[in-house]
Amino acid sequence: MEVLRNCFPSSVRRFLEELPESLDETYERVLREIKKPTRDQARRLLQCLVVAIRPLRVEELAEIIAVDFDDASGIPKLKPGWRWEDQEQALLTSCSSLIAIVGTSDSRIVQFSHFSVKEFLTSPRLATSSQDILRYHIALQPAHTILAQACLSILVRLDDLIEDSDTKKRSPLAGYAAEYWVRHAQFEDVASRIKGMEDLFDPDKPYFAAWCQLHDIDTPLPYPSVFFQLTSSGLSPRSGARTPLYYAALCGFSNLVEQLIIKHPQHVGAICGCYMTPAVAALSGRHFELAEVLHRNGSSVDPQGRAENSTLHSAAWYGDLEMVQVLVLDYGVDINTKNDVGATPLHFALMGDPALPAAVQLLLDHGADPGMQLLDGSTPLHQASRSGMIEMARILVEHGASVEVQNNRGETPLDVASGEQRDEMIKLLLGHRAK
């Protein structure tokens, strides 16, 4: 407005005519104004902002510029001497008005100045722009590769004697790197493009232990597709020293797993971690082909823990239909295997979270015996009758479950349903009594 106030009317008209007609044109002008010496770093910063899993703080984003992606060793390395003194000003200078810095003095967050900036940078429209603008088009795979590589360059500078707070102080990006680098590396084919992963997973170097100390990814993931948790299934937690092979399998890094099998074959059959074996760790992440490779080399897909629950028990508990099929059809796991209280996977499917009729149906279709009894004599039909699971009970009786069998207290499923006043269940069971 100050410019317009000092212009003659004809100049004002000409100024207005030269204004960008769209947001795209506005952003293109901003990109063209980025100085040549800072173009590469601006592009990397924008790439990282696009794919960051959580908002990045000023010091975290600025740390990426201290990574030499063209190090003579061929592996990107952190160069502490490259760190900016005035990080906020340097970021704003590099990325111009495309970014904004918000938050308190204790936590300054870098974000795009408008949501449309991210949409513009990743848009196919930008991919067809002139060469000076095309360099800023952001494809997701290269962007994830840049951020994963930056994170890895931090992690291979850690050692296992440094406390978490000191580590984070040494590198502001250490916390983010430890927690999220795997998720960036898992995007499409990024893991195969990262340089230096072998160093992080080398058991003879301190970096692997330091990473696990800073953030341990070996925890059952909090969504339904994960098929077991130790607290409910009884599998032994971390019974043994963690191995890089186990973690590589957990991450689904196929090339790295194959290298580690050759270099450290003693780790293939080792028992450790939440999932106990590398093969089960791979299965937990749906890395089925990798699990098969590990299984062929001697890693069990059916370890048993302190309560003798099998992997199939856990899959049934979580109603994980795909995993049940893989374990039974591909690996021949005993579908009627019992734990130390006599529970089969079918019992677990009825007790599970969630308890799915489809899981019960699948187990029965693949040969689960509906007459198997717990140590107290209870059958799956006793369980369904007590809980009022009409659909489950119907499936069980259709597959031959007896309504007359007694538990150790002499109760039939009908007795149990009567005691719980399950009227609809009583009607169903009466209809299937022996004539």
Feature map (PLM): residue ranges:
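Ankyrin repeat domain, specifically the short helix-to-loop turn at the C-terminus of the second helix
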Residues: 259-267, 292-300, 325-334, 361-369, ...
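Leucine/isoleucine-rich amphipathic helices and adjacent mixed helix/strand linkers
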Residues: 1-270, 277-296
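Ankyrin-repeat boundary/"N-cap" motif
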Residues: 235-245, 270-280, 304-311, 338-344, ...
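Leucine-rich solenoid repeat scaffolds
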Residues: 406-435
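Alpha-solenoid repeat scaffolds
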Residues: 37, 56, 161, 191, ...
